[in-house]
Amino acid sequence: GCSKRDLDDFYAALEEADLVVIATPVYHLSFPAPLKALIDRLQRYWSARFILGKRPPISKGKRLVLLTASGSGSPEGGPLLEKQLAPPLTVIHAVLAERVHAVGADSPDFEPAPYLEAARLAAHRMV
């Protein structure tokens, strides 16, 4: 485990959660560093599964909603983050239930309304 026990409250909340929402910008077709660091700190669940053989490492299953925003107009960012999230989702007993990937946010012509509506509809499907 990590030498610092600074995420104990986070781990407890994660283990009890029914739903996890990740809302993040896409930086260079990846996660920003603070989110990547948090994902890396899920190592305790990876170790529980693959070293200790505990399957699933978190007994309570959960659904995950991924909301991304890319500055560029390229649609690649959100789906790449989905692929990067796939392994950590298995060890936290989560399935990607909904996703909304906003693209072109840096454009002066960017219109957020369709993405906000898609996120609203995704939220309604989660309840």
Where are these regions (language model features)?
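Helix-loop-strand module that forms the ligand-binding subsite of alpha/beta enzymes
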Residues: 3-86
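Short, basic, helix/turn surface patches
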Residues: 1-7, 54, 118-127
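Glycine-rich phosphate/pyrophosphate-binding loop and the adjoining helix
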Residues: 75-79, 83-127
